[in-house]
Amino acid sequence: MEQTWRWYGPNDPVSLDDVRQAGATGVVTALHHIPNGEVWPIEEIKARQALLAEKGLVWSVVESIPVHEEIKTHSGNYQQHIAHYQQSLRNLAACGIDTVCYNFMPILDWTRTDLEYLLPDGSKALRFDQIAFAAFDLHILQRAGAEQDYTQEEQQQAAARFAAMSEADIAKLTGNIIAGLPGAEEGYTLDQFRARLAEYDAIDKAQLRENMAVFLRAIVPVAEEVGVRLAVHPDDPPRPLLGLPRIVSTIEDMQWFKQTVDSLHNGFTMCTGSYGVREDNDLVRMIETFGDRIHFTHLRATCREDNPKSFHEGAHLQGDVDMVAVIEAILSEEQRRHQTGDTRPIPMRPDHGHQMLDDLKKKTNPGYSAIGRLKGLAELRGVELALKRRFFPELP
């Protein structure tokens, strides 16, 4: 596996020197300063590459070129946004960048309710609390029909939770959900968010899939033409939220992608933390079934709680993900590719990390502090090395 590190650009509190010292050779980044829907110019791409090259690093994976909301809703200037996306792919390929991660989650990117969940050892993790989320949906957002998405017990618990919240608690929870986490290109006020939700009133899963199909049929041929590997990221968490449909949550969804545009360039990001939240997702089976289309991996583990829709992020080798089995499956796919002449390792990054040690005193991007990811990368590297020595000695 190629060891990579997500970097949010020059304003990231984790420096490129830090990245290099962590042992990563590739960087996963994006041009966050370019507005959604605009073309990524070649000169901007080359400028970012030059910045990385100064530190002996390469831009391995784009994460992400954001998909404009008008593409998802099939409205407004969606055709122009698709054309701009196509051109951005061409420009990236012209600069030698051939792997692009993206997602098709409506409105919200990845979602958490608590960005500072205190663990028993004193470190902090990200958490999704189903009851806190229900309190937001039912009592803060006050979404029409929201009660249909929660059990009676969850509704009662949410009402009690909301009743105990201060104004500061309400503001913090609201901000955590709709203000935009790292990687999300848009944040909203409550009124803006309600207006966005209304745009999806007539869009169910079938319609969102159709809108996705239009997008895929437009961009995959361009990816084939210029040699770019597209890697769609799963929904996080992998189930409908706030009445919004989700279409990248299960192995059945992956099969739909393959059938809709059957091309090796129409591939996947295997995010074990996103898919792994669902107990019915067999991660090893997913890798074995779609191995030739897995172009990028995010490795992290989550811990489901008493309410199975609640979870927090565990250490990389702990939790509900059998990380050793996952890495073995990835290495098996790499070995298969080697035997066919494809010697490029699959890019991997340690996804998220606990805020710990000195990082507890620093301002960090939630989930993306340095030390927790450094620890995770070291652990994942150790598992990979042990498996290679034992089962895959021919892999470099």
Swiss-Prot record:
Its cofactor is Fe(2+); Mn(2+). Keywords: Iron, Lyase, Manganese. It comes from the Bacteria. GO terms for biological process: D-glucuronate catabolic process. The keyword Manganese applies. Coiled coil: none annotated. Belongs to the mannonate dehydratase family. Catalyzes the dehydration of D-mannonate. This is Mannonate dehydratase. It comes from Serratia proteamaculans (strain 568).
